[in-house]
């Protein structure tokens, strides 16, 4: 399955990241960071429709994206209507980079979410250091224990967390964990097929809505 391959590749890359900047150093940089985060949660919670514009170079399902305009031009366009920006940092399958997020941080005050396949605390610390205001955690690739560990770490660093689900079981897990922000992905990450009805199935009032 595609998701398994992506996670396997991420596991292979983690030692490379930690060799470049050690876990101890990345942790120190994140904890000592005095950067004030822009609230991703507030950007979504405001009245009316909220738009998250995404910077993505490629994807397994669509190949290379439209790269005819510069990053600066694209972020300028996003700033005209977006409430937040999503930046892909996964290298092998989406051609992302932490460098893109660093550059975007210099171009905008909009909240930025790091979109990646986060499986290790190192990646959360790194998100803080490179300028992200939030991180994506995908329920399908994390058990509850690791999910809670990464979730709590993110909030301790002043980062919001978008918790991604695709089915009823994942939705219930997130409700049980009492997470703050849940995003429903219409794309099945195991097959990469899209079903637009997915979000409709799981957007009825949740038990905690009364």
For the regions a protein language model found, what residue spans apply to each?
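Conserved anion-binding
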Residues: 119-193
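Short beta-strand elements of ligand-binding domains
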Residues: 114-116
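Conserved N-terminal beta1-alpha1 strand-loop-helix module at the mouth
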Residues: 1-101, 106-110, 119, 161-162, ...
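Single conserved hydrophobic/aromatic residue that forms the stacking wall/gate
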Residues: 202-210
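Hydrophobic alpha-helical segments that mediate membrane insertion or helix-helix packing
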Residues: 104, 112, 127, 174, ...
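Surface-exposed amphipathic alpha-helices with a cationic face
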Residues: 45, 101-106, 128, 148-155, ...
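Hydrophobic residues within beta-strands of alpha/beta enzymes
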Residues: 85-86, 112, 135, 182
């Amino acid at each position: 399955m595609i998701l398994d391959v992506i996670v396997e590749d991420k596991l292979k890359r983690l030692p490379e990241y930690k060799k470049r900047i050690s876990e101890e150093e990345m942790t120190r940089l994140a904890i000592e960071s005095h950067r004030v985060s822009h609230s991703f949660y507030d950007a979504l919670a405001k009245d009316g429709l909220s738009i998250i514009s995404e910077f993505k170079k490629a994807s397994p399902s669509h190949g290379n994206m439209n790269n005819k305009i510069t990053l600066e031009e694209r972020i300028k366009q996003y700033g005209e209507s977006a409430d937040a920006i999503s930046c892909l940092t996964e290298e092998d399958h989406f051609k992302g980079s932490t460098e893109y997020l660093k550059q975007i941080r210099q171009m905008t005050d909009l909240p930025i979410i790091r979109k990646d396949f986060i499986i290790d605390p190192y990646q959360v610390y790194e998100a803080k250091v490179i300028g992200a205001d939030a991180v994506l955690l995908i329920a399908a690739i994390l058990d509850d224990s690791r999910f809670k560990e990464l979730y709590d770490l993110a909030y301790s660093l002043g980062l919001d967390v978008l918790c991604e689900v695709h089915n009823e079981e994942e939705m219930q897990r997130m409700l049980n964990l009492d997470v703050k922000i849940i995003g429903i992905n219409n794309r099945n990450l195991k097959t990469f097929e899209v079903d637009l009805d997915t979000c409709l199935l799981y957007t009825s009032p949740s038990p905690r809505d009364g």
